[in-house]
Regions:
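Alpha-helical transmembrane segments of multi-pass membrane proteins
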Residues: 22-39, 209-213
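Secretory targeting signals
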Residues: 29-71, 75, 99-181, 185, ...
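Hydrophobic core of alpha-helical transmembrane segments in multi-pass integral membrane proteins
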Residues: 24-32, 206, 240-256
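Junction motif at the cytosolic side of a transmembrane helix
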Residues: 186, 190, 244-268
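Membrane-helix interface segments
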Residues: 16-17, 89-91, 193-198
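Central hydrophobic cores of alpha-helical transmembrane segments
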Residues: 22-26, 194-208, 268
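Aromatic- and glycine-rich beta-strand/loop motifs that create alpha-glucan
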Residues: 1-22
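Helix-loop-helix units of permease transmembrane domains in multi-pass membrane transporters
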Residues: 70-104, 264-266
C-alpha cells in the first residue's frame, strides 16, 4: 500500500498540476486582497473572513473534485483502473487512490487557509495597506478580542488565542474537504456517466443548500459550516452535524465501491 501511495503521489507532479496547486493555495489570499479595499475594517478577523468566504462557496465541491478526482475519472474512463486493480489488488488500488485524494485535498485546503491567516493577522496589520480601504475604523486594542470572539462560528475559540481559532477552523475545513473529496471519488467510481460522477457532489451540495434554507434550517447547511459568515455565530456542535452527514455518505459510497470491486470494469 505504501509504495502504491508513493507511486500515485509521484504521478501528480507536472507543470500544469503545479500551477493549479499554487493557484489553489493563493486563491483565498488573492480574493481577500481584491475585496478588502471595498469593505469596512475593524479587526484582522474581518480580512480573514473575506479571504475564506465569497463566491467559491457556490462551487466548492467542484473545486475539490478538480484537485484529484477529475484526473482519476479520466483514468477510470480509459480502463486504467481495471488494469491497475488486477496488477496491484483491489484493496491496494482503492486504498491508494483514497489516501492520495484525501492527502492532496487536505494539504491544499489547510495550506491555503493558513497562508490567508498569516496574511490577514500578521502581514496586513503591520503594513499600510489597510489604511487605504473603505471604512477603515480599527477598534481599540482592548476591544479587538471581544469583537473577534463574537463575529462568526469558530471565532469563539479565539478566547484561547487567535492561533487556536485559526488552527481549529482551518483543520475543520480541511477535514470536511477531504470527506467531500472522498465522496466525490466514490460517486465517480459508481456512476456510469463520468460527468454525472464528477458533478454528483456539487448537485447534492446545491440541493441540500436550497432544501435546508427552505426548511428554515440554514444553520445545518454544508455551506454554512464551511463558510460561516452568512449566519450569526453558532455553538461548535452545529457545524459538526453536516460534517457527520457527509462522513456517513462517504463511508456508504466507499463500502458500495468495495462490494462492487469485482465488477469495476463495468463501472464509469
Amino acid at each position: 500500500m505504501r509504495s502504491a501511495v508513493r507511486d500515485e503521489l509521484s504521478r501528480l507532479w507536472s507543470v500544469p498540476a503545479a500551477i493549479f496547486y499554487l493557484a489553489f493555495l493563493a486563491y483565498p489570499t488573492v480574493q481577500g486582497l481584491i475585496l478588502i479595499p471595498s469593505y469596512a475594517y475593524q479587526a484582522p478577523i474581518d480580512n480573514f473572513t473575506l479571504m475564506t468566504n465569497g463566491p467559491v462557496a457556490l462551487v466548492f465541491p467542484l473545486l475539490l473534485t478538480g484537485v484529484y478526482v477529475f484526473r482519476f475519472s479520466g483514468l477510470v474512463n480509459h480502463r486504467y483502473a481495471c488494469y491497475a486493480r488486477f496488477r496491484s489488488g483491489t484493496s491496494t488500488f482503492l486504498g491508494a487512490h483514497l489516501i492520495v485524494n484525501a492527502i492532496t485535498v487536505g494539504v491544499l485546503v489547510l495550506g491555503s487557509y493558513l497562508i490567508a491567516a498569516a496574511v490577514a493577522f500578521l502581514v496586513l496589520p503591520s503594513t499600510g495597506f489597510l489604511r487605504g480601504q473603505l471604512g477603515y475604523e480599527p477598534l481599540p486594542a482592548d476591544q479587538v478580542a471581544d469583537y473577534t470572539q463574537q463575529l462568526i462560528t469558530f471565532s469563539q475559540l479565539a478566547s484561547a488565542g487567535v492561533g487556536v481559532y485559526v488552527t481549529v477552523f482551518s483543520l475543520f475545513v480541511a477535514v470536511f474537504s477531504m470527506v467531500i473529496a472522498t465522496a466525490s471519488l466514490g460517486f465517480t467510481l459508481l456512476a456510469r456517466s463520468r460527468i454525472l460522477g464528477l458533478a454528483a457532489t456539487l448537485i447534492l451540495y446545491t440541493v441540500e443548500n436550497f432544501a435546508l434554507s427552505y426548511a428554515g434550517l440554514e444553520v445545518f447547511r454544508t455551506t454554512t459550516a464551511i463558510f460561516p459568515d452568512a449566519i450569526t455565530p453558532q455553538p461548535l456542535w452545529v457545524p459538526m452535524i453536516p460534517l457527520a452527514a457527509w462522513i456517513v455518505l462517504a463511508v456508504v459510497l466507499i463500502a458500495r465501491v468495495r462490494r462492487s470491486a469485482d465488477q469495476l470494469e463495468t463501472l464509469a
